[in-house]
Amino acid sequence: IIPENDRPIDLDSLSRWAHSRIDAHIERCTNEALMEWLLNPHRIGDENNLNREEIIEMAHCGIDLHLEEVRNCHSNLNMEELQKWRKGGQRGTFPAPDGFANSGEHIPPEISTGSITWSEAWAIARPWFVDPDAPPFSMQTIHPEQWFQGEYDLVYRWNGKIRIIDLKASVGNNDRSRLYSEQLRLYSWLWWETHDRGDIVDGLEIWYLGPGKRKIVDSPDEKELIRISKEMKEIYETLGNINSEDDAPLNPSPIHYFEEGGIQIGIADNPVERCKTCPYVALCPQGGHDASLPNHKTA
C-alpha cells in the first residue's frame, strides 16, 4: 500500500517509490533466502558464488516489468471498470495480496475521484502472487484428481483477461529455456482443469529478470487443452507402471541454443550432445561406460 503522503503524481514518482522498496527490503530478503538454502541438506553450490549486485539488478528489472503493467492499466482501464473498482464490495476468489483480509467487504484505500490516479493504477494492476513467506508447497495449485500440481508466480487480471507470468532469475540464454514455454502451457492447462474447464487463460509470459525481457508464449485453446490433458494422464499412468528400463527407453532430447530473453537460435548437430555432460552417464545403459563395481566395494 502506498502511504497517502507518498502517493505519486506521475509515473516517474511512482517508479522512484517502487524502486526504493528494493533498497528497503533486499538485504533482509536475500539473507533469509540464503539461510534457508544453507539449512537445506540437498543444496548444491557455494554461498560464496552469491552475487548480491546481480540480485539487486534483477529485482529492479522485475519492478520495471510490473511498472509496464501499471502504465498500461493507467492508459487503458475504462471509466466503467474504474468506477466499479472504486465502489469496493465483497472480495473475489483469491484476491491479489494487499495486506487486507482475503474475504469480506473491502473498500480500497487508494480510491480517488475523476481520472484514474497512479496510486489507483498501482493497486488495480496488482497481480496475485505467491506469498514469499508462505511455507514451501503451501500455495501449490493441485489438479482435481490430485496427480499434478504447480505454482504460478504472478497472475494478472486487471483488464478482465487472465495472464500467467513465470519469473526466471536468469538471462535465458541456455538450454533450460527449452522447457520454460512448455511449463507455462502446463500452467494454462492446470488453470483450466481447476476452474471446471470453464476459464481459458488469455496470455502466458516468461519474464527473464537478467535482461529484463518478456517472452510471449502462445496460450493453448480448448482443443489443445483437451489434448494436453490426455497426454498428461498417459504420462502419469506410464510413470506409475515402469518396472524395467525397457518400459522407459532412453531418448535424450537435443541441446537447444538460445540468446538472452529465451530466443532460440539453433539446435546442436550431435543429437546426443547433452550426454557428454550428463551426471548419470556412468549409470546409463547407453552411456558407453561400465558402472559395475568390484565385489568388495559398495556404492
Regions found by a protein language model. Name each.
Residues 4-164, 197-202:
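Catalytic cores of nuclease domains that cleave nucleic-acid phosphodiester backbones
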Residues 167-176:
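Short beta-strand-loop-alpha-helix junction that forms the active-site gateway
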Residues 181-193:
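An active-site-proximal "capping" alpha-helix that borders the catalytic cofactor pocket
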Residues 58-61, 65, 186, 230-238:
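Long, highly charged amphipathic alpha-helices
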Residues 130, 144-147, 176-177, 191-299:
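Metal-dependent nuclease catalytic regions and adjoining charged, substrate-binding loops involved
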